[in-house]
Amino acid sequence: MATLKEKLIAPVAEEEATIPNNKITVVGVGQVGMACAISILGKSLADELALVDVLEDKLKGEMMDLQHGSLFLQTPKIVADKDYSVTANSKIVVVTAGVRQQEGESRLNLVQRNVNVFKFIIPQIVKYSPDCIIIVVSNPVDILTYVTWKLSGLPKHRVIGSGCNLDSARFRYLMAEKLGIHPSSCHGWILGEHGDSSVAVWSGVNVAGVSLQELNPEMGTDNDSENWKEVHKMVVESAYEVIKLKGYTNWAIGLSVADLIESMLKNLSRIHPVSTMVKGMYGIENEVFLSLPCILNARGLTSVINQKLKDDEVAQLKKSADTLWDIQKDLKDL
């Protein structure tokens, strides 16, 4: 007796399992992981989305909730499991998992606890998707990108930290607000370490090719009557303020990660400030990851732009590199 489905649908091609073309995995379904997931779905970047976490109920609930929105999305398959086999054949894996910093906890201690989490996660990712590109989002992102690179054995062009992509987006938004224009028309770069010791490259800030520092030579310095330096200070403080107000940040970082993925999956060769291995650049001698303007395309992070930096900016980069290496050199089990 033919089923309703058999009566309704006459097959033309043989049914066979197809390997996804643009599968994306998000590891960790906390606030940041789910913001990445919804941003990826909203931009229709994946033909399959996989979610992984250790919390099975939360994981299943998030998966079902997204699946129920399938009518409004163009991603035909949304799957989730605590077993990493669900991630097989991913093009891109986004890592948002990790432990939170406890009050009074040193960064070294926080990083070491995250190393122990990553020691479980990273080998599993590589086992099931040996050709994937990994985007690390968990904080402290620059150190955890190094940790991921070490644990994965992947070439450095396939291990990328979300780095200063969001810091630069915040910077451009805040400057554009002051000027009354759209952030996409206000160009500026924040480089180096994600967070407190990031470097604002004032010499490169421009609107329609007009250098703002040429109009105001004191821009970014303490002598600036318009106090543009405050904009960079606001970038650094903005995450803390959002956390104070709502408990965490998630939407902007989710959108920022989807932006990086779009550049790679669509082979756009756009330039983003993301965390990459900077040994040998700007006189940095250790294996640390910091954000520089990088070209992202289908192969991953394929090139770095040689940004003209001033001496004090290079000094800041080196200082960040030393700070990171101080922590990295004491990490166990890498």
From Swiss-Prot:
Residues found modified as Phosphoserine: 44
GO biological process: lactate metabolic process; pyruvate metabolic process
PTM sites of type N-acetylalanine: 2
The protein's Enzyme Commission number: 1.1.1.27
SUPFAM superfamilies in the cross-refs: LDH C-terminal domain-like, NAD(P)-binding Rossmann-fold domains
Active-site residue numbers: 194
Compartment(s): Cytoplasm; Mitochondrion inner membrane
Matches recorded under InterPro entries: L-lactate/malate_DH, L-lactate_DH, L-lactate_DH_AS, Lactate/malate_DH_C, Lactate/malate_DH_N, Lactate_DH/Glyco_Ohase_4_C, NAD(P)-bd_dom_sf
Entry membrane topology: Peripheral membrane protein
Catalytic activity reported: (S)-lactate + NAD(+) = pyruvate + NADH + H(+)
GO terms for cellular component: mitochondrial inner membrane; mitochondrion
N6-acetyllysine PTM sites in chain numbering: 7, 58, 119, 329
Keywords annotated in UniProt: Acetylation, Cytoplasm, Membrane, Mitochondrion, Mitochondrion inner membrane, NAD, Oxidoreductase, Phosphoprotein
Biological or metabolic pathway of the protein: Fermentation; pyruvate fermentation to lactate; (S)-lactate from pyruvate: step 1/1
PANTHER family reported in the protein's UniProt record: L-2-HYDROXYCARBOXYLATE DEHYDROGENASE (NAD(P)(+)), L-LACTATE DEHYDROGENASE B CHAIN
Family of this protein: Belongs to the LDH/MDH superfamily. LDH family.
Name of the molecule in the record: L-lactate dehydrogenase B chain
Organism of provenance: Pan troglodytes (Chimpanzee)
Lineage: Eukaryota, Metazoa, Chordata, Craniata, Vertebrata
